[in-house]
Structures are given as structure tokens and as C-alpha cells.
Amino acid sequence: MRLLSGASASRIPCPLLSLARARARCLPVPASATACRAASSSAAAAAGDGGALKPWLFVGLGNPGKVYQGTRHNVGFEMIDVIAEAEGISLSSMQFKAMVGKGRIGDAPIMLAKPQTFMNASGESVGQLVSYFKIPLNQVLVMYDDLDLPFAKLRLLPKGGHGGHNGVRSIINHLKQNRDFPRLRIGIGRPPGKMDPANFVLRPFNRKEQEELDFAFHRGLEAVRIMALEGFNKSATYVNTAQSSEMLNR
């Protein structure tokens, strides 16, 4: 997809997120994650010889500016907004070309980031954040839209290629071709008929799609909470189980 340009980088609240945010504010930390807090505290104590726990870096990809708000290509940004709202984190700092917010999930330090470089140059920001804060790549979760997944479905992977996504391609390039970072792919479905995918990803959602996407954000928030406290594998199990149960209940 071609690099888009010319939009303001200001953050404007998205009506699409209202229901998801309302749910997120009331959503409890999973019971298994709560039980893990003691283990997390123990890990922090073990790092007490001058070291400190490295934060998880949760990155959502998108294009800045009002014109792109609420479009399919920006679901990564919207996922970050849901997490920030639920965990009381303000993305009030601009660092390394990204809107950044720092906080905690339980005892786990986290950092949220929305690169403001436009999608196709996301790596310029992510590469600098990873390098400056010395974050291990297995603690860098990148969240973005995926044309090849059914709408509102999630796929959590420990590593992989860019799959044709230019934002992820840019990140890999700026990490010196290292692909060993997890990613949460958020399905936006395929374009209808012969529509150009580059145009499709800039389309807004209809009301029914918004409702489905709210549930996807709900699952994504839960997955992030579990990942921060219990690790990638537990989070992946949750995502797979939640979606399997949803299909059985239809």
C-alpha cells in the first residue's frame, strides 16, 4: 500500500471506540492474571541488583490525522486507544516520532506507542523506541490491520514476516531484518468485488462492523493484559480459546 501523506498528526477521539471504551473501563483483569501478580513482584525483586524489569512495548500502527480516523487501516491505533482508556494511561508524550504513554498492568510496566510517521514509515519510530529503551524484541507487540483475516478476527503470532503489510515491513527493516517480535493481527476482511485494497483500507466501518470490532477490541485488551502478566503463550491460548468458543456459540 502506498504511503499516505498530508494529514495532521493530532489525536482526535474516535466515535467508533465509545462502546469498546465503556466496556473496557468495567472489564476486570483476568483472574489468572491477578494470581500472577505475586510472581511478577517476585521477578521484580529478583531484578533488584541494580537492574529493572523492561517494559512491554505495545505498538499500534496507523496513519495520523482526522481524515484517517475510524478507517480500517487504523485499527492498530484504535486498539492502543482502548488499552490506554482501560488502564488509565495518557499518550501525552511525543518521543521518537510517536505518541507515547507509560503505565502498568498490575505490576508489569508497559509502554504504549502510536507512530506518527504514517504507516509505511512506522519502523523509523519503532526502531528508535526499541533501541533507546533497550526493550527485548520478544516484549514488543505490534498491532495492525490484516486483509487476509476475516473481519474482527484476531491472530496472535510470536514472530514472522511482513505478509505484504508495509508498516510491518518498515519495522523489520529498521530492526536490521530481525523478525522475532510478536504481532497481533486484526482482521479487516477482503475488499468487495474488484475494489483496490489501497482504497478499501481507507474506508470507514458501518454500524454492524463497528459492533463486531468492539468485541475484537475487548478480546485484544484481555490478550494484552494476560501477555503483560503471564507471557505470550498464555495470551495466545486465550485468543485461540475465546475465538473458538465464539464460533461454537453462533
From Swiss-Prot:
The active site is at H73. Its main location: mitochondrion. The keyword Mitochondrion applies. Its EC number is 3.1.1.29. It catalyses: an N-acyl-L-alpha-aminoacyl-tRNA + H2O = an N-acyl-L-amino acid + a tRNA + H(+). One of its GO terms (cellular component) is mitochondrion. It holds the Pfam family Pept_tRNA_hydro. SUPFAM superfamilies: Peptidyl-tRNA hydrolase-like. Gene3D superfamilies: Peptidyl-tRNA hydrolase (3.40.50.1470). Residues 1-45 form a transit peptide. It comes from the Eukaryota. It is found in: Mitochondrion. InterPro entries: Pept_tRNA_hydro, Pept_tRNA_hydro_CS, Pept_tRNA_hydro_sf. TRNA binds at Y68, F118, N120, N166. The record marks D145 as: Stabilizes the basic form of H active site to accept a proton. GO terms for molecular function: peptidyl-tRNA hydrolase activity; tRNA binding. Keywords: Hydrolase, Mitochondrion, RNA-binding, Transit peptide, tRNA-binding. The keyword Transport does not apply. The natural substrate for this enzyme may be peptidyl-tRNAs which drop off the ribosome during protein synthesis. Belongs to the PTH family. This is Peptidyl-tRNA hydrolase, mitochondrial. It comes from Oryza sativa subsp. japonica.
